[in-house]
Amino acid sequence: MKKILVLAPHTDDGECGCGGSIVKFIEEEADVYYVGFSSAKKSIPKGFPQNATEEEFKKATHTLGLSKNNLILFDYEVRNFPAVRQDILEDMVKLNKDIAPDIILMPSFNDTHQDHSVIASESFRAFKSASILGYEMPYNNITLNANVFIFLTELQIKKKLMALECYKSQKMRMRGGIDFFENLAKVRGIQIGTKYAECFEIIRWIIK
């Protein structure tokens, strides 16, 4: 059974970038882990409780089919990852020892958000024996060398959209709304002759 580790700088990044693929991998009986590094408490709008994103994270990942035993949520401060990159690296090294993942799904090296950039660069250092794919974050990517596409069914995309709907506190930050992600999946699907897909770029691929 393949072990797949999703690295999300903030809660909801994994759902945005590879939520459909997470559903697909779980359906194919892969052992999928999801690690969020920040619940972005400072970005929670007024009117929502301070634990809003933590609770939304639990609901969203449950919607995707993830086991709660395969979830980890750290408490790093949003937009401050560059100042604590060594701590983040050490957490990743421990994750590598504890989980020994075969495949990492993480932000692209071309992601301009400072927190996403730290996760990408430190992941490359920490998970030296794992294959690594960078997922698409259209809001932040300068470019994306989309050289891996994953076929997705309509139901898998629906589960991704349902997971994103769980993040009530973040709706105003989703430019284009939830429909944007459905339309993006359609565009990626058209590129490879199917209805829906998600794309990734190969950072490192290991054949054992």
Regions found by a protein language model. Give the residues of each.
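Active-site beta-strand->loop->alpha-helix modules in alpha/beta enzyme cores, enriched
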Residues: 1-131, 165, 180, 184-188, ...
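Structural signal for conserved beta-strand scaffold positions within catalytic alpha/beta enzyme cores
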Residues: 36, 73-75, 134, 149-151, ...
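A short acidic, often aromatic-flanked loop/helix-cap motif at beta-alpha or helix-coil junctions
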Residues: 78-82, 140-142, 156-157
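Short, surface-exposed, charged loop/turn segments at secondary-structure junctions
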Residues: 120-123, 148-152
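Short loop segments at secondary-structure junctions
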Residues: 129, 153-155, 205
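Short, flexible loop segments at boundaries between secondary-structure elements
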Residues: 130-151
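A conserved mid-domain beta-alpha-beta active-site/ligand-binding segment of alpha/beta enzyme cores
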Residues: 150-170, 175-180, 185-186
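Short, basic/aromatic-enriched C-terminal tail that caps enzymatic domains
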Residues: 193-208
